[in-house]
Amino acid sequence: KRALRNNYHKNAEWFGTFHNQELKGDVGYEKGVIRRDPTMVIQVDGLYYAWYTKSTGKTYGFGTGDPEKKVFPWDKSEIWYATSEDGWEWKEKGLAVTFGPKGEYDDRSVFTPEIFVHKGTYYLVYQCIKAPYLNRSFITIGMSIADKPEGPWERLEAPILEAAKDGKWLGEEDS
């Protein structure tokens, strides 16, 4: 109702037309592997780059009570990247960002990345989950920084954004 009241449906910036196209290369469908949430595609020195959430294994949901079971497709995931010379055929290059150390804000899962580039420095921002993940947790936003798109990526020791524990927004706009 709020979106209709605020006329978001009349704002062209919120809507676009998408066309599905089968991926070529080694990042397409693979049984038992989940690849989702790709970043914007950037081009560096004639090569295209994209980062994405990657996870393997069966998803069980919250009902098991086992803290080691994967509860969502993006649970126990990492951030990987792929490159392309033409933007159509992609080659998976490898891991970009993995979980943080045990007990840290990102020790369970890192997912839904986005890439930013500023003055020759590369910034990956992404959602993070801290274990245990038996019920909806407060998700944080982490960041890793690199001097080149291939990495190595240096993880920040603390999240750049955390949810308020009381569930209240700081302002009234769209709340």
Task: Please provide the spans of the model-predicted regions.
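Carbohydrate-active catalytic/glycan-binding domains of CAZyme proteins
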Residues: 1-175
